[in-house]
């Protein structure tokens, strides 16, 4: 999608309140990707993305900005937590697994696009597979009359299948099953091994299963995709997308910074993780199930609150790989009020739509919304600042009884006013000990 930086920021304004600096920097970074692709191949290789370090408390919009953009522009995107990785030689996930995760995200993205483009062919394949089970093909040498009868029966069955009349009927189908897909107890560090065995086909077997036709339609989608779609071209396109459009969002990077005030260096593996991360961010080759993925042009966005450490506590080499830094603003009551009212799918709209399913019309008057924002802001000031996430807790507590008794208000309109907000939340916010547990 070819959008100018101004258009990108305008799009983000519908979902993320404030944070103009962060939006601007990311918009420029994404536009530079488009600009790079217009250049000669030789020059493209020399232009590397300027990675971004976002500094700000939880809940201020760091992840949301990156996630929304990646989804809107159709870029492969993954969010990982730096604190979940371990240094090479320690038990746990190695940093290369984030690149394999990005490869999987790119592969799924391209597969879904191709399935959508070839939807009619895939639906026809699934339809024919199910019809073969419902009405097995006639043997050779059957009379023309019998063949005509069979053809008519097949078309009647096809019509019923398309109309959903047979959805509850049960059939036995044969589907591929991989032992790694069905074993949830495998450790995360087995990710590379899983990719390898899937590529060479080891551990995969055909199993027969009885299921309803509506479930069989979904179960056969993968097989249909494997048969109809060009798997090699899908992998090739996924590799290209991951390398040139991939975004890896590294959250909690402050958790692997070794604080200068910590003379004991309680966790020596933190620096080890940083050093393992360095070649990935600088540019290296990682083996994935879609091929050797070069990380040179992946955009890395790191984020952290940096309450107990500073960006300068990261090793100098890693600091240098994140040249663009932006500090996100904390959210005051005015920003929280806007978060409740401005976004397309604001929190209040979500709750209203949920209760609408119970035939209950829910409204919030303006004074009530302002009071909710004030209470959330005060809770953030007096306790840990969790940004906009505090609104979820506050509104859940406010609407707890109404959600429980929603059926009693069916067919009615319920207006949340300032008085109700004060009655439900006033005593809690005044009692700091109680507020710590509830809000």
Swiss-Prot record:
<feature type="binding site">
    <location>
        <position position="251"/>
    </location>
    <ligand>
        <name>ATP</name>
    </ligand>
</feature>
<dbReference type="GO" id="GO:0051603">
    <property type="term" value="P:proteolysis involved in protein catabolic process"/>
</dbReference>
<dbReference type="GO" id="GO:0005524">
    <property type="term" value="F:ATP binding"/>
</dbReference>
<comment type="subunit">
    <text>A double ring-shaped homohexamer of HslV is capped on each side by a ring-shaped HslU homohexamer. The assembly of the HslU/HslV complex is dependent on binding of ATP.</text>
</comment>
<dbReference type="GO" id="GO:0043335">
    <property type="term" value="P:protein unfolding"/>
</dbReference>
<dbReference type="Pfam" id="PF10431">
    <property type="entry name" value="ClpB_D2-small"/>
</dbReference>
<dbReference type="InterPro" id="IPR050052">
    <property type="entry name" value="ATP-dep_Clp_protease_ClpX"/>
</dbReference>
<protein>
    <recommendedName>
        <fullName>ATP-dependent protease ATPase subunit HslU</fullName>
    </recommendedName>
</protein>
<keyword id="KW-0963">Cytoplasm</keyword>
<dbReference type="GO" id="GO:0036402">
    <property type="term" value="F:proteasome-activating activity"/>
</dbReference>
<dbReference type="InterPro" id="IPR003593">
    <property type="entry name" value="AAA+_ATPase"/>
</dbReference>
<comment type="function">
    <text>ATPase subunit of a proteasome-like degradation complex; this subunit has chaperone activity. The binding of ATP and its subsequent hydrolysis by HslU are essential for unfolding of protein substrates subsequently hydrolyzed by HslV. HslU recognizes the N-terminal part of its protein substrates and unfolds these before they are guided to HslV for hydrolysis.</text>
</comment>
<dbReference type="GO" id="GO:0009376">
    <property type="term" value="C:HslUV protease complex"/>
</dbReference>
<dbReference type="InterPro" id="IPR027417">
    <property type="entry name" value="P-loop_NTPase"/>
</dbReference>
<feature type="binding site">
    <location>
        <begin position="59"/>
        <end position="64"/>
    </location>
    <ligand>
        <name>ATP</name>
    </ligand>
</feature>
<keyword id="KW-0143">Chaperone</keyword>
<comment type="similarity">
    <text>Belongs to the ClpX chaperone family. HslU subfamily.</text>
</comment>
<keyword id="KW-0547">Nucleotide-binding</keyword>
<keyword id="KW-0067">ATP-binding</keyword>
<dbReference type="GO" id="GO:0008233">
    <property type="term" value="F:peptidase activity"/>
</dbReference>
<feature type="binding site">
    <location>
        <position position="17"/>
    </location>
    <ligand>
        <name>ATP</name>
    </ligand>
</feature>
<dbReference type="Pfam" id="PF07724">
    <property type="entry name" value="AAA_2"/>
</dbReference>
<dbReference type="InterPro" id="IPR019489">
    <property type="entry name" value="Clp_ATPase_C"/>
</dbReference>
<dbReference type="GO" id="GO:0016887">
    <property type="term" value="F:ATP hydrolysis activity"/>
</dbReference>
<dbReference type="InterPro" id="IPR004491">
    <property type="entry name" value="HslU"/>
</dbReference>
<feature type="binding site">
    <location>
        <position position="389"/>
    </location>
    <ligand>
        <name>ATP</name>
    </ligand>
</feature>
<feature type="binding site">
    <location>
        <position position="317"/>
    </location>
    <ligand>
        <name>ATP</name>
    </ligand>
</feature>
<dbReference type="Pfam" id="PF00004">
    <property type="entry name" value="AAA"/>
</dbReference>
<dbReference type="InterPro" id="IPR003959">
    <property type="entry name" value="ATPase_AAA_core"/>
</dbReference>
């Amino acid at each position: 999608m070819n959008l100018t930086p101004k258009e990108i920021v305008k799009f983000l304004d519908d979902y993320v309140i404030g944070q103009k600096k962060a939006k601007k920097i990311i918009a420029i970074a994404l536009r530079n990707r488009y600009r790079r692709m217009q250049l000669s191949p030789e020059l493209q290789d020399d232009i590397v993305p300027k990675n971004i370090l976002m500094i700000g408390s939880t809940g201020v919009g760091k992840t949301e900005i990156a996630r929304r953009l990646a989804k809107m522009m159709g870029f492969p995107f993954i969010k990982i937590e730096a604190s979940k990785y371990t240094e090479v030689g320690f038990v746990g996930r190695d940093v290369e697994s984030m690149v394999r995760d990005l490869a999987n995200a790119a592969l799924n993205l391209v597969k879904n696009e191709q399935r959508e483009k070839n939807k009619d062919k895939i639906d026809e394949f699934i339809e024919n597979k199910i019809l073969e089970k419902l009405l097995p093909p006639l043997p050779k040498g059957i009379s023309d009359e019998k063949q005509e009868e069979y053809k008519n029966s097949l078309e009647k069955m096809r019509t019923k299948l398309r109309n959903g009349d047979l959805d509850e009927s049960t059939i036995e189908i044969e589907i591929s099953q991989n032992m790694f897909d069905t074993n949830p107890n495998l450790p995360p560090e087995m990710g590379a091994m899983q990719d390898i065995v899937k590529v060479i086909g080891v551990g995969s077997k055909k199993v027969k299963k009885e299921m309803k036709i509506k479930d069989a339609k979904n179960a056969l989608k993968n097989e249909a995709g494997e048969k109809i779609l060009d798997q090699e071209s899908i992998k090739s396109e996924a590799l290209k997308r991951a390398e040139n459009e991939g975004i890896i969002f590294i959250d909690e990077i402050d958790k692997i910074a070794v604080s200068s005030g910590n003379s004991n260096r309680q966790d020596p593996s933190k620096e080890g993780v940083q050093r393992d991360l360095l070649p990935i961010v600088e540019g290296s080759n990682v083996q994935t199930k879609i091929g050797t993925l070069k990380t040179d042009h992946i955009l890395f966005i790191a984020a952290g609150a940096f309450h107990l450490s500073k960006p300068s506590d990261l090793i100098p080499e890693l600091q240098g790989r994140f040249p663009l830094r932006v500090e996100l603003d904390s959210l005051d009551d005015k920003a929280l009020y806007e978060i409740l009212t401005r976004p397309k799918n604001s929190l209040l709209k979500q709750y209203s739509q949920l209760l609408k399913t119970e035939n209950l019309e829910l409204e919030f008057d303006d004074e009530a919304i302002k009071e909710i924002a004030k209470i959330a802001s005060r809770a953030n000031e007096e306790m840990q600042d969790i940004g906009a996430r505090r609104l979820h807790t506050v509104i859940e507590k406010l609407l707890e009884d109404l959600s429980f008794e929603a059926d009693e208000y069916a067919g009615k309109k319920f207006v949340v006013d300032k008085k109700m907000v004060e009655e439900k939340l006033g005593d809690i916010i005044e009692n700091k000990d109680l507020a710590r547990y509830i809000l």
